[in-house]
Amino acid sequence: MGRAARWFKGIFGMKKSKEKENCVSGDVGGEAGGSNIHRKVLQADSVWLRTYLAETDKEQNKHAIAVAAATAAAADAAVAAAQAAVAVVRLTSNGRSGGYSGNAMERWAAVKIQSVFKGYLARKALRALKGLVKLQALVRGYLVRKRAAETLHSMQALIRAQTSVRSQRINRNNMFHPRHSLERLDDSRSEIHSKRISISVEKQSNHNNNAYDETSPKIVEIDTYKTKSRSKRMNVAVSECGDDFIYQAKDFEWSFPGEKCKFPTAQNTPRFSSSMANNNYYYTPPSPAKSVCRDACFRPSYPGLMTPSYMANTQSFKAKVRSHSAPRQRPDRKRLSLDEIMAARSSVSGVRMVQPQPQPQTQTQQQKRSPCSYDHQFRQNETDFRFYN
């Protein structure tokens, strides 16, 4: 028994020494190759891998020694069983060669001893085999778990290396492309500057329009048609404007800030004036039909939405072109002076109009006047026209 165990230990001891030499040589070569291939791997990961490989080698050696001991025990049991079988064979052969001289009692005793001894040897061999199978299962399970852990650790190291490389690339891209924020700031500044320029140009054009209104001729045009036809024409004009009226209204807000421009309302109509005259109210003449406010509202300040407002033709330029062009032929309308208009209204309504002497206007009243109408051309206050029954 002892000789067999020593023999097995000697064999496995030689194998272990050879395996250690091979492992040492393989580790040296692997470290040299790894240093040449993986130069960019972090130092902490490389140290961890080295320690992990050393620990795994030690554990493998321990398990190999345990397996060798188990196999040696099984071999000892097999040798003992063989020796017992040889002894039984010798006893049986000696009894047979002695002839039939022995008693039956001795034969029965010999058979009984042999059966008991064979059963003992069989049970011992079975126990050894069971222990060997269990040891093999444990070793195989440990090896499988070890391989899985190695693969997981290698994946973690690979992911760390990839993340480090990606972070370096991102840093390089950020270093080589630092001008995006500056370009955005320049764009915003240029937009603000262009808006300021457009607002200043519109203010200048409004100033020119006001200067032109002061020198415009004092002519009033009156339509002899009914109010229904006038409302129809206004509806047609608004429908022809279409969706552009929204954008024109926005431009109108920029060109006429505050309450400087006032539209003619129902209070400026002749019917309302006659009804108010019955109640001894004062009356102010309405602004002409073609006023600067209406032109600014119903005529686009620029032909297209894509063109900026400061490149459009101003109202003073349009008025100059209109003055140089040929006059329109309007047979349905006639031009009357202010006296004829007021006389016609007084004759129709049956009231008497008294016109007092004009009074000079103060500077505050002139500032309150709308720069978009022709009211400042007549130089009359609210008390200029009085209606009596």
UniProtKB/Swiss-Prot annotation:
Start and end residues of each stretch annotated as Calmodulin-binding: 137-151
Which Pfam families does the record cross-reference, listed alphabetically? DUF4005 (PF13178), IQ (PF00612)
Presence of keyword Repeat: yes
GO CC terms in record: cytoplasm; cytoskeleton; plasma membrane
Name residues in a coiled coil. none
Say where the protein is mainly found.
membrane
| SUPFAM superfamilies reported for this sequence | P-loop containing nucleoside triphosphate hydrolases
Record-annotated IQ domain positions? 106-134, 135-157
Q: Give me the ranges of the annotated region Disordered.
A: 347-374
- What's this protein's family per the entry? Belongs to the IQD family.
Which purpose does this protein serve, as stated in its record?
May be involved in cooperative interactions with calmodulins or calmodulin-like proteins. Recruits calmodulin proteins to microtubules, thus being a potential scaffold in cellular signaling and trafficking. May associate with nucleic acids and regulate gene expression at the transcriptional or post-transcriptional level.
Q: Indicate what this protein is called per its UniProt record.
A: Protein IQ-domain 26
